[in-house]
Amino acid sequence: MQAAAVDNPRLPLRPVLVWAALVAIISGLGLIPFYAFVPDLSKFTGNLPAAQLALLGIAVELAAVGPSLAAILVAWRMPGAGGARSLFRQFRHWRVHPIWYLIALLLPIPILLAADVIWMALGRQSLVWLTVPGAIPFTIGAALVPPLGEEFGWRGFAQPRLQRRLGVFVPGGSKLFLPSDVAQTYIRLISTAVIYAWIYNSTGGSLPAVMVAHAAHNIHSGFIPGASVDPRHLGPLLGALCYAAAAIVIVLATNRGTLTRRLQASHRALRRGGT
């Protein structure tokens, strides 16, 4: 059932356009308090009135859940969008081969460590190889809120509708239109989107597997933070480039139309041709 949703060319495109507009609106609303209270995030120390801090917290959470919130609203209220149940049904598709959960859980580790190795090879020795995050509740929140708040939208709603018409890279490339601070953020977002699309399609549309991958990235990023002194933010750029390298390997090793194994994609094409 879920695999059919991934490959279904009949899903209408209009709902995803409405979804994209709604995501942009929600993200914009989430940015307003930051522009009002913290125009320069590099100088943010947390020394703000309690009401402003609370508003910033609400804004962060609103932006974090924007993609999924928009997807649920559009699927629920817009004719032809499939209904909210069809979206939540993908969350029940958790019975996939265990190797995909291992990949989702462990893949960020070699990628992040590779960035640290490159950092050392460049002669920059101020590394923190493994730390326990000081804000454990924040780390737990980062492992839960972004996967739940984003993947119902990006993977569960947008990807099946976009990839058959415009290509599997469009859902990830569309993140270029999200507001961000630096180029490395776009590189990382698009690269992780390719990786998550690969997992999603290869598992026949398993949102739990993708959410594990998303959560694993956030958790491992907290435990393997990399450079301790990095005024030019070279460390995050190296991490983003390593994610880009992993995404390129996936693209080269799979069918570029679906990011699934070439043999698997050929068998699907033969089955469609036979019917």
Question: In which residue ranges do the predicted regions lie?
Answer:
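Hydrophobic alpha-helical segments embedded in the membrane of multi-pass proteins
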Residues: 186-195
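Membrane-helix interface segments
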Residues: 12-17, 83, 96-99, 132, ...
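C-terminal membrane module of polytopic membrane proteins
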Residues: 39, 176-181, 202-275
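Aromatic-anchored segments of alpha-helical transmembrane domains
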Residues: 24-32, 109-114, 170-171, 214-224
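Juxtamembrane helix-entry segments on the extracytoplasmic side of multipass membrane proteins
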Residues: 127-140, 173-187
